[in-house]
Amino acid sequence: MDKNSRYTVDSSILFRQWLNDTREMVQDTIFHSRIQKKNNNHLVSQRVFFEQNAHSHYFSYRNNKNLFKENPVSYIRHQSLYNVLKNLKKGRYNPDISIDLHGLTQHQAQQALGELITTCQKEKIFCAHIMHGHGKHILKKQTPFWLSQHPDIIAFHEAPKFFGSDAAIIVIIEINSLKKNINIFN
């Protein structure tokens, strides 16, 4: 036996002798915080899911009569907000958030747009950038139609060249705190 192994054998024997008269403690404390957090997270995620579905519900109307044939695509909810659209066309609004719909199905794209609107309203972001791409022109044709159906969309216009030109849209979203004072965009 070498010197190091003798110390480990002796020390383990001493340790066992030292703990010989001890007994195991019974854990009698019950922790509920973990379960409550789990339930709260579940309720929060469920509420967010319902909010996103509520926003994507507006996109479910299918009767589009090719409303957006003109190029570039633009929309304004009400003529009194024409200055917003004019500033949007001039590129005076820089989007704070962006979403890419490339490779998504129509249903997934609707869900993603609902998530975008929910996020923008929670974070108080009024300008968003939506990349729909070229592809087979399915999302390119449907996205403006879906956005025009949503009551919280103030205006949108084809993105400037820097943001993707005709493969993207810049959107102005109404935020609840700005509903009273819509002239902030002027």
Curated annotation (Swiss-Prot):
Pfam families: Smr (PF01713). GO terms for biological process: rescue of stalled ribosome. GO terms for molecular function: RNA endonuclease activity; rRNA binding. Keywords: Endonuclease, Hydrolase, Nuclease, RNA-binding, rRNA-binding. It is an enzyme of class 3 (hydrolase). SMART domains: SMR. Residues 99-174 form the Smr domain. The keyword Transcription does not apply. InterPro entries: Smr_dom (IPR002625), Smr_dom_sf (IPR036063), SmrB-like (IPR022990). Its EC number is 3.1.-.-. The keyword Nuclease applies. Belongs to the SmrB family. HAMAP family: SmrB. Acts as a ribosome collision sensor. Detects stalled/collided disomes (pairs of ribosomes where the leading ribosome is stalled and a second ribosome has collided with it) and endonucleolytically cleaves mRNA at the 5' boundary of the stalled ribosome. Stalled/collided disomes form a new interface (primarily via the 30S subunits) that binds SmrB. Cleaved mRNA becomes available for tmRNA ligation, leading to ribosomal subunit dissociation and rescue of stalled ribosomes. Associates with collided ribosomes, but not with correctly translating polysomes. This is Ribosome rescue factor SmrB. It comes from Buchnera aphidicola subsp. Acyrthosiphon pisum (strain Tuc7). The lineage of its organism: Bacteria, Pseudomonadati, Pseudomonadota, Gammaproteobacteria, Enterobacterales. The gene is smrB.
